Amino acid sequence: MMLALATVAANAKDVLDAPTWTDNLTTTAEAKDLTRAAAMAVDNEGNSIVTGSFTKDLEFAASYLEPVANSAFIAKYDKAGAKKWAAGLAGAATVTTVATDADGNVYAAGVFADQVAIKDASGETKATITGMADKVDKVSGFIVKYDKQGAYVASKTILAESDAEIAALDMIGVLSPSFTAKKLVVDGNKLYLSASYKGNVALDGVTLQGKYACSEGWLYNDETTMCVLSFDAADLANASIVSVLGATEQLTNEATYNTEDVNFAINDGKIYVAYVASGKDMTLTAAGKDTKIETAYEASATEHAYVLAAIDGDQVTTQVYHSVATDNSNTLNTIDEMAYQKGKLYLAGSFNQALPFDNTISYLGGCDAYVACLDAASLNKNWAVASAFDEGDAKHKAEIISGMLVDEDEVTLVGWVENTSDRTIEAPLGYQINTKTPAIQKGEQVLITSVAENGNYALYQTDNVNGSDEDKTTEGTYSYIFYSNAESSGISKVLADDNTIDWDGNEVTLAKSADITVYTAAGAVVKSAKNVKSLSLADAAHGIYLVKVGKQALKIVK
């Protein structure tokens, strides 16, 4: 059963506008094997590209894929919701990001282990990629390109290795080289990829140098460095370094300096990169130029600074937003979302220190969600807001951001409260930010695990993982809901009326008796009752529904 959703009421419309299409896609024999928050994209024509994991035979339109272990799929729906094709990576692989270009080509990147067969839409193996030797974890990187029909075009593996000189030192430590793709963006004839890595990475004659830390003179470990790379979009060749942030020295003896997150946005050839980093002696490299970055760092307290760079050809503008050093051992400082719109940059994520964009803003519980708006030309702050939501146990709960939608007057933020001990979702989160004020308010509390948009097209995803033993006995299903006009998606600020609708995952309950009607996302009536205070949906299929009570409406996910 899907996680119970929080109470929410609406009176914005008599009935929220129906989506263009919805679909449920079952891909795993056990729900626990689903890749949560699976990457998605929407192309310029409104076609939806979805990804995820599959452990059972996958039939999608004319495509048929057979899994090897927990495999990864990439599938395409057209604007009307018709299934077009599915391709895949048969083997231990996970797609972490996906993008499209102006011609409808599809690019996916992620992590894998051992040997993985790359399948096209016909199910034929077009290439086999091999990961780092003797590594069972998914620590090797890949990029794959398909055309708009699902035909294989090109692929690339990205492998890290421990530095030979460091590994030969007379010290004790376990080195764990890795490369993890984070975000893909196509701009013109270039494909851009942000990533984190440990160890040395060699690509097309370009080398990313691994960084290491030594403590007590004998114990050493990898440090995390993050970067943005570019490739020729046509064939994934000619790798080039756009930006890197990591420790200045290859081997530091005082402390561990890590880059903790990276995100980026592109507009008209100008690249905006944002990092989270901690360490006294860090170096930002952009357009071949080095800038020293220093954050407050002591043995018992660390600052997690937000470092931004605007790269326009060989011109680089930088800005560092500092916080206050804290002794938080559980660091939750992220840039989960980043977007450019009309001369402004919007960043969203979580933080558990004084907010670097405004040190007067603190957090509650384990962390808070934030949205910051910057002037793209100067990288100066326009405004910043935070959720001020106390999710409870500071050591075991966190606010996770899964999507951000930006328009001229409003920013919508969605996500969930997660138990960090077992990664279970405890409650959905939704926030609306009025960009004119600016002010943040709670929005519709509907579980959305992934979001993709392109212009007025918007695609939302959820799944049926609930973190209980049911995940071992229930098939894993992704649910999608697509709007061809995002302004009528219903993912907007909602207000309380004179009744309250509750949903516990099985039953709809009201504060007072009224007529209840339940619709599918496409508008068909599923169930109705008159003058009642509750209505059971225990026998309804998993999916997205709309509950209407008078002038109120509530989207639920079962």
Tell me the role of every PLM-derived stretch.
Residues 1-13:
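Sec-dependent, cleavable N-terminal signal peptides
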Residues 5-8, 374, 500, 514:
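Generic secretory/membrane-interface signal
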Residues 12-489:
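A sequence-level/structural motif corresponding to short, flexible coil/turn segments enriched
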Residues 492-558:
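C-terminal outer-membrane/trafficking sorting elements
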